[in-house]
Amino acid sequence: MSDRRFGASYSDCGLYRYSLWRDWSGGDGTILWIMLNPSRADHLGNNDPTIERCERRSVAWGFRRMEVVNLFALRSPYPKALREADDPIGPLNDAGIAGSAAQASMILCAWGAHGTLRGRAGEVRTLLADKPLHCLGTTLAGEPTHPLYLPYGRVPVPYGRE
């Protein structure tokens, strides 16, 4: 990808990443990925495996920009940390999610099975009640699947609000 730009928004203390974005020439619109929690991808353009797959999909689907927000803004590659932390959500996370959603051409939910932790998936669905949501499929429990191990042939479908 030529002309690739990147960045992220962090809390002052560095414990939370509120958003991550990648921008490239070509395409149109912004896809917003809502996942579980930030791992190792950063503002310098370094991708972890999940962000790499999201970026490839976003380009293939014709978007010009992708942004990633998370149910939990706490930076950790381990979902277990979300259960143990006093505040895994982060004080500015809901405002960040709502602001990013307001600018998105498509919102793709992809937090996987752990999204039900602390009732967080339901809170975010309520926060975005007026927005059309999409996913790449759902788990047996009805949560949107995480994109890491899904085939690239999967395309976004409407995500219900059951």
Task: List PLM regions with ranges.
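Residues at alpha-helix caps and immediate loop-helix transition turns in enzyme cores, especially N-
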Residues: 46, 50, 119-121
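Active-site and ligand/interface coordination hotspots across diverse enzymes
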Residues: 1-48
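Membrane-helix interface/capping segments
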Residues: 43-46, 78-85
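Short connector loops at secondary-structure junctions
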Residues: 64-80
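Glycine/proline-rich loop-helix segments at beta-alpha junctions forming the active-site rim
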Residues: 82-162
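Short catalytic helix/loop segments, enriched in acidic residues and glycine
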Residues: 49-59
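Short, glycine/serine-rich, charged loops/turns that create anion-binding
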Residues: 38-40, 73, 114
